[in-house]
């Protein structure tokens, strides 16, 4: 009897035009190859197949290690929140660094060539906007470490994004801010004890954003250091003797703040 009541209720709602929302998720993911400046880029797309309507798209830019399992997992986490997430390949050919020396080489080469950064970011953005599940007018970006610096630079140079979020991003790599050109709202999550971001770099970027009238938030987590959102940070820190460490509290709190931030962007 109870089952029959549920069936009749669903039929009634469908007949009256009321949308029926299912709590069941079906996260699908796939690799997407594209080109930027003649280089093959290997992106990664994730979304909930059971959501029928178009939804916001989020670009996810990797740490200095490259587009690895960690960053693809973040894309899947965003898909579970109802977004279409596209993990960007900034290095090309899906290159992954296994050692900090390689990571430094890959990231520094791009940091010195912002035109290539813009080209690769823009091509990934175009791929995301064209996905049939995506509302092309609702695009944001998040980035980690090296990727945090990338999304900040793109936003501060006037990229057409609703918002960007930087997690333990490279704040010292930020270029000049174009006053009046910034369209995106910005949120920065930083570890208070992050050795990779100096006090001067933090003060400099905040001063630049204030002077340019940027809508931004800066959140600092006590006792958190670089890579605080990455559960593998402890392993990397010990293996290579570099100041990286996972901080579960900062990870949880920053992700919660991100969810609120994204909801505010697209409401």
Identify what each model region corresponds to.
Residues 74, 198-209, 221:
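Short alpha-helix in the alpha/beta-hydrolase fold that links the catalytic acid
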Residues 188-190:
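Short beta-strand/loop motif that positions the catalytic acidic residue
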Residues 7-17:
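Bacterial N-terminal signal peptides
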Residues 210, 215-267:
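C-terminal catalytic histidine-bearing segment of alpha/beta-hydrolase fold enzymes
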Residues 181-186, 212-215:
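Short, proline-enriched alpha-helix->beta-strand connector loops that line the catalytic pocket
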Residues 31-133, 231-245:
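Serine-hydrolase catalytic machinery in alpha/beta-hydrolase-like enzymes
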Residues 193-197, 226:
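Acidic catalytic loop of the alpha/beta-hydrolase fold
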Residues 121-182:
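Primarily recognizes the serine-hydrolase "nucleophile elbow" in alpha/beta-hydrolase
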């Amino acid at each position: 009897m109870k089952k029959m009541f549920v069936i009749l209720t669903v039929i009634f709602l469908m007949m009256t035009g009321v949308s029926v929302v299912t709590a069941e998720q079906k996260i699908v993911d796939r690799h997407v190859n594209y080109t930027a400046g003649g280089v093959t880029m290997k992106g990664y797309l994730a979304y909930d197949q059971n959501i029928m309507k178009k939804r916001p798209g989020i670009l996810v830019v990797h740490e200095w290690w490259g587009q690895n399992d960690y960053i693809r997992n973040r894309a899947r986490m965003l898909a579970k929140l109802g977004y279409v997430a596209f993990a960007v390949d900034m290095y090309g050919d899906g290159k992954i660094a296994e050692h900090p020396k390689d990571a430094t080489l890959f990231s520094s080469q791009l940091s010195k060539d912002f035109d290539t950064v813009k080209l690769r970011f823009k091509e990934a953005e175009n791929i995301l906007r064209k996905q049939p599940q995506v509302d092309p007018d609702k695009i944001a970006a998040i980035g980690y470490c090296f990727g945090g610096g990338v999304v900040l630079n793109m936003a501060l140079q006037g990229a057409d994004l609703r918002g960007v979020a930087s997690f333990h991003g490279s704040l010292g790599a930020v270029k000049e801010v174009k006053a009046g050109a910034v369209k995106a709202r910005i949120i920065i999550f930083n570890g208070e004890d992050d050795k990779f971001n100096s006090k001067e770099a933090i003060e400099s970027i905040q001063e630049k954003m204030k002077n340019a009238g940027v809508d931004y938030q800066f959140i600092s987590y006590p006792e958190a250091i670089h890579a605080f959102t990455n559960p593998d940070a402890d392993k990397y820190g010990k293996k290579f003797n570099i100041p990286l460490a996972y901080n579960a509290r900062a990870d949880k709190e920053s992700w919660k703040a991100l969810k609120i931030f994204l909801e505010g962007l697209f409401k």
